[in-house]
A protein has these predicted regions:
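A detector of single, family-specific signature residues
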Residues: 1-361
Length: 361
């Protein structure tokens, strides 16, 4: 059977046809990532091999392979999507260390011809949608974290004593006060009862009037910068507005993600320490777990498998994680593993066992 290797690019792809014996048929084709370009690929194949059966191979390069994969899948073709590391390994076997799109598409076809490869596939539509939302949520969380850091930088300059009043600068009570008053001068001049009402409301009656008094005293005695107050307060107002907007986005995202998660018969969230969103993220990244031949394959997919360093009789005992798999899955696993280690569960017991064996956190 003929093999069509496709080197994936953002605006153009490159295709090469290889015979079952490993001979390239004709020259490679460069085609645009459009309907017209995909049609030219079909014409190119027919011109070179007619209606002979063929399969396709391509690398999982970012998200750029999705459209051509969908196009070919709709036409009933078999498509093998491989990890770029696999074709890179074959490239290193060639004497000429050349890399261009034409050679890459040929090498991708060769990987498929040799048959020594693992495949990636387009996920179920609901899994794909949930994965997109979870990854987008991750980027929104990162943006919010950056804003929190910038708020902290401003407060360290204009009111360095303020953060010590709370467990964290950006807790609800703290942000409620800053949103209303912005500067230490405004806090100092605020009526005590008005300030306390904000504190009482945002803390759900957990904090007393003593906290309002303490904050006002700190504002009156602050060692913060006194100049350019208007510029600092303007920045602070914009940053708080942006953070409030992102909070609303995250809330809406969570609702969307949970709608998809509830479509699956998944019980990850029943494990103590794993929340619904974390469970959805893990499920979205793994997809159909049956596509992994073993637990080791799943561990490698997450990139938490240890690297192996051996030479002759030497074997390293200080190996690190490969970090070659999905960074989103790896991050989610790290977070839930940390949380689970604090809960009374079998995972906590296993964590303590490993710590007792001398393993680091």
């Amino acid at each position: 059977m003929y093999i069509v290797g496709i080197d994936i690019g953002k605006n153009h792809h490159e295709a090469s046809i290889v015979s079952p014996e490993g001979k390239q048929i004709g020259r490679s084709l460069r085609f645009a990532t459009t309907h017209k370009g995909a049609d030219s690929l079909m014409s190119f194949i027919f011109k070179n091999i007619g209606n002979s059966p063929c399969v396709f191979g391509m690398e999982a390069t970012g998200h750029y392979w999705y459209p051509i994969y969908s196009f070919l899948k709709a036409k009933g073709y078999t498509i093998y999507v491989i990890n770029p590391i696999q074709s890179d390994s074959l490239r290193k076997m060639y004497i000429r260390q050349t890399k261009n799109d034409s050679i890459d598409s040929f090498l991708i076809a060769e990987v498929i011809r040799f048959g020594q490869f693992g495949t990636t596939s387009m996920a179920d539509e609901n899994i794909l949608a949930m994965r997109q939302l979870c990854r987008y949520r991750d980027s929104v969380i990162s943006s919010r974290t950056e804003i929190k850091l910038r708020i902290g930088t401003i407060m360290e300059q204009i009111f360095p004593e303020y953060e010590k009043q709370f467990s964290s600068l950006c807790v609800s009570t703290s942000m409620g006060i800053l949103e209303k008053y912005l500067t230490p001068e405004n806090i100092e001049n605020a009526p005590i009862d008005e300030l306390f009402e904000i504190i009482k409301d945002k803390s759900h009656n957990r904090l007393t009037k003593a906290k309002a008094i303490s904050i006002k005293e700190a504002a009156a005695d602050t060692f913060g910068i006194k100049i350019a107050q208007d510029a600092f307060s303007f920045q602070l107002k914009q940053l708080i507005d942006r953070m409030n907007f992102l909070d609303k986005q995250i809330e809406a995202l969570d609702c969307q993600i949970l709608e998809y998660y509830e479509k699956f018969d998944c019980y990850l969230h029943t494990i103590p320490g794993i929340g619904m969103i974390a469970a959805a993220t893990i499920l979205a990244e793994i997809g159909d777990i049956n596509r992994f031949k073993s637990s080791s394959a799943l561990v490698a997919f997450a990139g938490i498998d240890p690297t192996v360093r051996q030479s002759g009789e030497f074997s390293s005992t200080h190996n690190h994680m490969s970090k070659r798999g999905s960074p989103y899955l790896r991050h989610a696993i790290f977070l839930v593993a940390t949380t689970c280690s604090f809960h009374n569960s079998p995972l906590n017991a296993y964590y303590k066992k490993k710590r007792d064996q001398g393993k680091h956190h």
